[in-house]
UniProtKB/Swiss-Prot annotation:
It comes from Oceanobacillus iheyensis (strain DSM 14371 / CIP 107618 / JCM 11309 / KCTC 3954 / HTE831). The lineage of its organism: Bacteria, Bacillati, Bacillota, Bacilli, Bacillales. The keyword Zinc-finger does not apply. SUPFAM superfamilies: Purine and uridine phosphorylases (SSF53167). This is 5'-methylthioadenosine/S-adenosylhomocysteine nucleosidase. Belongs to the PNP/UDP phosphorylase family. MtnN subfamily. GO terms for cellular component: cytosol.
Length: 229
């Protein structure tokens, strides 16, 4: 069994790298793969780069090179629910693209032609994530995570996405692409995102200020999940 763990930025995987043993590094097309062990489990930690194309490419290379048994995507996101705070974690029940529009061809908004409207996370991994969050006493919610190639800093941007997807809990830039690749490879996945900012509320300042806190909480979740897998 090989567990694939994906993060977009150095800050999102730094603590995980520190915990790995027997680590080796491989660079492919600008993506960095760190193989080794975490709690005696075989893991491949992937630094994918930011955005949907980078995430999809990196996740595909991960599958072709390492054939992961499951994928856990860690990192940060912007929160939407009023009861969520910076540092809280959102666990994906399902993931979708918020910036895809093929409605002219009778697809629902957010649906890539030929693909499902949403990508459902593996229920066992979702339940494990939720269980671990209770153990380490970090607030979490299970729900919808939306992905697009924009950092949502302005209220008018976030209002549009909220209107289209009122049940969304978090917004970020890689998860749906990772989920789509996992769907094609039939690989179980879960997305876990710690909130580094509240979308639409001075996001650029808040993101920089709280990224390390979000990264720490996300890493705690992954480390404890791997221990129980």
């Amino acid at each position: 069994m090989t567990i694939g763990i994906i993060g977009a930025m150095d800050e999102e995987i730094a603590l995980l790298k520190q915990q790995m043993k027997d680590m080796e590094e491989l660079e492919v097309a600008g993506c960095y793969f760190y193989t080794g062990h975490l709690h005696d489990k075989s893991v491949v930690l992937l630094l994918s780069g930011i955005g949907k194309v980078n995430a999809a490419m990196a996740t595909t290379i991960l599958h072709e090179r390492f054939s992961p048994s499951m994928i856990i995507n860690t990192g940060s996101a912007g929160g939407f629910a009023s009861d969520l705070q910076v540092g809280d974690v959102v666990i994906s029940e399902e993931v979708l693209h918020h910036d895809v529009d093929a409605t002219a061809f009778d697809y629902v908004y957010g649906q890539v032609p030929g693909m499902p409207a949403t990508y459902k996370a593996d229920q066992r991994l979702v339940e494990l994530s939720s269980e671990v969050m209770k153990d380490i006493e970090i607030n979490s919610r299970i729900g919808v995570i939306a992905t697009g190639d924009s950092f949502m800093q302005r209220k008018d941007q976030t209002d549009i996405v909220k209107q289209r997807f009122p049940g969304m809990l978090a917004l970020e830039m890689e998860a749906a692409s990772i989920a789509q690749v996992c769907y094609r490879y039939n690989t179980p996945f879960v997305i876990t995102r710690a909130l580094s900012d509240i979308a639409g509320q001075e996001s650029s300042v808040s993101f920089d200020q709280f990224l390390q806190t979000a990264g720490k909480n996300a890493a705690q979740l992954i480390i404890n999940m791997v221990k129980k897998i």
